[in-house]
């Protein structure tokens, strides 16, 4: 198998047991990148713009990197599937900014590598 094949392998579906761990991991990693405490990302309300965008990024990564559908991602973050769909659109629109795109690509690469190492175990 070539390196290209490995990098473009479709995401593996997580078991229900893993979803809670993934949610905490994403909140910690994304929260650190955006200087937002994980508690703010877990809040029931939208919160301030930085916390809301960090939560949107975490939901986007849940869908893109870990392959969860909108409903499953919504359950992880205690949000509706339409909220996750909106988050994905917002994040995709923000990728027009080169700095945001580079940060998101780095997060996707790191979390994708983590996923591949966990799947092999």
Predicted segments, located by residue:
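General nucleic-acid-binding
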Residues: 1-28, 121
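Helix-turn-helix DNA-binding elements, focusing on the entry/boundary residues of the two helices
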Residues: 27, 69-70
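Short, amphipathic alpha-helical "recognition" segments used to contact nucleic acids or chromatin
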Residues: 52-67
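DNA major-groove recognition helix of helix-turn-helix
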Residues: 63, 87-88, 95
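Short alpha-helical "recognition helix" segments of helix-turn-helix
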Residues: 71-77
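Helix-turn-helix DNA-binding helix
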Residues: 83-85
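Short Lys/Arg-enriched helix C-cap and helix-to-coil transition segments
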Residues: 95-113
């Amino acid at each position: 198998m070539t390196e290209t094949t490995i990098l473009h392998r479709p995401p593996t579906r997580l078991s229900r047991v893993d979803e809670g761990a993934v949610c905490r991991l994403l909140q910690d990693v994304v929260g650190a990148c955006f200087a937002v405490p994980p508690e703010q990302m877990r809040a029931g309300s939208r919160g301030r713009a930085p916390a809301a965008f960090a939560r949107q990024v975490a939901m986007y990564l849940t869908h893109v990197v870990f392959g969860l559908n909108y409903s499953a991602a919504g359950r992880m973050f205690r949000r509706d599937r339409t909220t996750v769909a909106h988050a994905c659109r917002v994040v995709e629109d923000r990728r027009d900014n080169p700095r945001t795109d580079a940060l998101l690509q780095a997060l996707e690469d790191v979390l994708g590598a983590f996923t591949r190492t966990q799947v092999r175990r």
